């Protein structure tokens, strides 16, 4: 017979208030208490919205308006559960109740579904590297990988390989921006020689001279092309559903993108690590060189590479930044968090929604309750 689980911790209102006064952000749902201090700056609605509810019951906020929280958001909340609110016998104002009467009861149909996360009973052993384990999940993999958790991930047994699989955010601009500057300067100088022609490999008579004045246009075109590549890779490669009977394709999916959906706030896995990124960058450079004149290919590539850097920086900020309410990045953050927690089959644009508009994969807007 399995041992009974340990009793939940309990706190009086006075104990909760002391923690709030010390700067913590605790909230409650009925009598259940949650410490969201570490999540405040990640909240898609902004820090202030969450801080304003410190010490309060958030049951109504979970159901909206303005936003009805998804099942995954409610599961996410349970990872921050710390205990129950209990009556303080020395405080006569509580009248023997640990929480106001209207918040004592919770929906019995919902409660079991979003119980406290039990890491010991998960489908994988979180004390061991995950990569080899996920391949054995089979049909359970897709549902499991789209139920995010608030903890870091380890993929490999080897410390060396593990180190190559993650990185800090600032490695991206440090490594790639100097290359963008060098390529831009080098290929601009090549354009100034006035001997670059398009279609010269097919016909000299109808080939087009590429003047230096088109440098900016080619560079911006490269950035625009990157936004399309970003969208296509995210939608069709990262969000492919691997066959449930393919151990290795499941592992490949988890390495490419599944790990990010499982642990969306693992800061060491939010941007593309330099070693695997170098392989992909080299592929795109060689591909462009094969189909275009060297200078044209190089300028397009430099623009695309800068587009990639901006994409990775934007992606990191959407997870860890706290943009001003109403700003472009605020709306993009809300859009991207919905992609993680509720709409995994839409909202594939990270740096822009342009291609979501074009291919009709926008995340549906929630109806304004004031208009109903």
Swiss-Prot record:
UniProt lineage: Eukaryota, Metazoa, Chordata, Craniata, Vertebrata
Subcellular locations according to the entry: Endoplasmic reticulum membrane; Microsome membrane
Function: FA2H is stereospecific for the production of (R)-2-hydroxy fatty acids. Plays an essential role in the synthesis of galactosphingolipids of the myelin sheath. Responsible for the synthesis of sphingolipids and glycosphingolipids involved in the formation of epidermal lamellar bodies critical for skin permeability barrier.
EC identifiers of the protein: 1.14.18.-
Gene source species: Rattus norvegicus (Rat)
Gene: Fa2h
Domain Cytochrome b5 heme-binding: 8-86
Binding site for heme: 43, 69
Tissue: Detected in oligodendrocytes (at protein level). Detected in sciatic nerve.
Listed name of the protein: Fatty acid 2-hydroxylase
Catalytic function, reaction form: a 1,2-saturated fatty acid + 2 Fe(II)-[cytochrome b5] + O2 + 2 H(+) = a (R)-2-hydroxy fatty acid + 2 Fe(III)-[cytochrome b5] + H2O; hexadecanoate + 2 Fe(II)-[cytochrome b5] + O2 + 2 H(+) = (R)-2-hydroxyhexadecanoate + 2 Fe(III)-[cytochrome b5] + H2O; octadecanoate + 2 Fe(II)-[cytochrome b5] + O2 + 2 H(+) = (R)-2-hydroxyoctadecanoate + 2 Fe(III)-[cytochrome b5] + H2O; docosanoate + 2 Fe(II)-[cytochrome b5] + O2 + 2 H(+) = 2-hydroxydocosanoate + 2 Fe(III)-[cytochrome b5] + H2O
Any GO BP annotation: galactosylceramide biosynthetic process
Ranges where the Fatty acid hydroxylase domain occurs: 219-361
């Amino acid at each position: 017979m399995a041992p009974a689980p340990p009793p939940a911790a309990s706190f009086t209102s006075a104990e909760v208030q002391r923690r709030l006064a010390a700067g913590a952000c605790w909230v409650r749902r009925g009598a259940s208490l949650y410490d969201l201090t570490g999540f405040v700056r990640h909240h898609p609605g902004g820090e202030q919205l969450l801080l304003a509810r410190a010490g309060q019951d958030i049951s109504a906020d979970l159901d909206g308006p303005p936003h009805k929280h998804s099942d995954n958001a409610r599961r996410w909340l349970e990872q921050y559960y710390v205990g129950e609110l209990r009556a303080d016998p020395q405080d006569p104002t509580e009248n023997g109740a640990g929480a106001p009467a209207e918040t004592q009861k919770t929906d019995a149909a919902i409660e079991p579904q979003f119980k406290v996360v039990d890491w010991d009973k998960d489908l994988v052993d979180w004390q061991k590297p995950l990569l080899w384990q996920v391949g054995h999940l089979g049909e359970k993999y897709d549902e499991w990988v789209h139920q995010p958790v608030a903890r870091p991930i380890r993929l490999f047994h080897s410390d060396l390989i593990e180190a190559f699989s993650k990185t800090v955010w600032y490695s991206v601009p440090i490594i790639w921006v100097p290359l963008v500057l060098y390529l831009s300067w080098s290929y601009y100088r090549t354009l100034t020689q006035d001997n670059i022609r398009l279609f010269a490999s097919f016909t000299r008579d109808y080939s087009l001279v590429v003047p230096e004045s088109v440098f900016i246009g080619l560079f911006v075109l490269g950035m625009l092309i990157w936004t399309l590549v970003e969208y296509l890779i995210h939608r069709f490669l990262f969000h492919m559903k691997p066959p449930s009977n393919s151990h290795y394709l499941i592992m490949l999916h988890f390495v490419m993108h599944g790990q990010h959906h499982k642990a969306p706030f693992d800061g060491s896995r939010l941007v593309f690590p330099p070693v695997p990124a170098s392989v992909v960058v080299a592929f795109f450079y060689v591909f462009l060189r094969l189909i275009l004149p060297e200078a044209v290919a190089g300028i397009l590539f430099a623009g695309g590479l800068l587009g990639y850097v901006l994409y990775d920086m934007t992606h990191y900020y959407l997870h860890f930044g706290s943009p001003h309410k109403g700003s472009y990045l605020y709306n993009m953050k809300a859009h991207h968090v919905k992609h993680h927690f509720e709409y995994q089959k839409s909202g594939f644009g990270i740096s822009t929604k342009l291609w979501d508009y074009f291919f009709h994969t926008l995340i549906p807007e929630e109806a304004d309750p004031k208009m109903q």
